[in-house]
Regions:
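Extracytoplasmic small-molecule ligand-binding "clamshell" domains
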Residues: 22-92, 101, 240, 253
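Ligand-binding cleft/hinge of the Venus flytrap
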Residues: 40-42, 56-65, 128-133, 145-164, ...
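Alpha-to-beta junction loops
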Residues: 64-66, 83-91, 135, 172-185, ...
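Ligand-binding clefts/hinges and TM-proximal coupling segments of bilobed small-molecule sensing domains
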Residues: 66, 144-161, 198-201, 231-258
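A ligand-binding cleft/hinge motif common to bilobed small-molecule-binding domains
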Residues: 76-79, 93-101, 151, 177-211
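Flexible hinge/capping segments at coil-to-helix
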Residues: 119-136
């Protein structure tokens, strides 16, 4: 390749990066976990589905961009974004102070409380610290709900799992006394055949210092314009009714929050 062509390729590459950093990209690579029903999971046909995915597609349509979805294990989500593997995270990720030190976020697109589920027939009937003292509680590691469990239930034993599916299996088989996760995730599960073993006993008040500022779209530092585009799109689909149509497919309550 000649020097002129190399120079031109470099200029085009820099221009493309600059456009992406300015939030003007027309194609975005979006990461989700693909293992957190009903928010994001792989259907029987191998296609990504769920609330996060449908909201993400609606946001992309509103922004008039093409979104290319990819799955990533939870612990690798932020490192992958920072390394440039993805342009955005839409994966039920809470906007917390700790995460804001590494990445930026849009405004929240849902905000629902931590919820406790126990086996049917359990003698545990309350979500108080005393009621769960000495009990074994399962949670997905690295999530806001695992932080809530460790900060609030200090007299309980907290067992962390790589995915929500694994703690559900242990609860179903009597290896856990309770689990903690998002209301939407657990409500959908207990209302399915797979979750018929168990029941919700209560929710915890949303505390910003623990739960964060709701669930947002994550982007790299320096791409605040892209975050703003997502924020504007969130408000637009909320206003035009698209959000409600998607919400009502998955939840019995409005997940949007305050």
């Amino acid at each position: 390749m000649s020097f002129t062509r190399l120079a031109l390729a470099a200029i085009l590459s820099i221009s493309a990066v600059s456009a992406s950093q300015a939030g003007d990209a027309t194609k975005l690579r979006v990461a989700t976990e693909g293992a957190y029903p009903p928010f994001n999971y792989t259907g029987a046909d191998g296609v990504l589905v769920g609330f996060d995915v449908e909201i993400g597609n609606a946001l992309c349509a509103q922004m008039k961009v093409e979104c290319e979805w990819g799955t990533q294990e939870w612990d690798g989500m932020i490192p992958g974004l920072v390394a440039g593997k993805y342009d955005a995270i839409i994966a039920s990720m809470s906007i917390t102070e700790e995460r804001l030190e590494r990445i930026s976020f849009s405004r929240s697109y849902y905000n629902t409380p931590s919820t406790i589920v126990v086996p049917k027939g359990s003698e545990i009937t309350e979500v108080t610290v005393a009621a769960l003292s000495g009990r074994l509680i399962g949670a997905q590691g690295g999530t806001t709900h695992s932080v809530v469990a460790e900060e609030i239930y200090t007299d309980s034993n907290i067992s962390l799992y790589p995915t929500s599916e694994e703690y559900k299996l242990d609860l179903e088989n009597g290896r856990l006394d309770a689990v903690i996760d998002d209301l939407g995730a657990l409500e959908g599960w207990i209302n399915s055949e797979a979750g018929s073993c168990c029941k919700i006993i209560g929710t915890l008040p949303i505390q910003t210092e623990l739960h964060g500022q709701g669930i947002g779209v994550g982007v790299r530092k320096g791409q605040e314009e892209l975050a703003d585009r997502f924020s504007q799109a969130i408000l637009a689909i909320r206003e035009n009714g698209t959000y409600t149509k998607i919400n009502d497919k998955y939840f019995s309550q409005d997940a949007f929050g305050e």
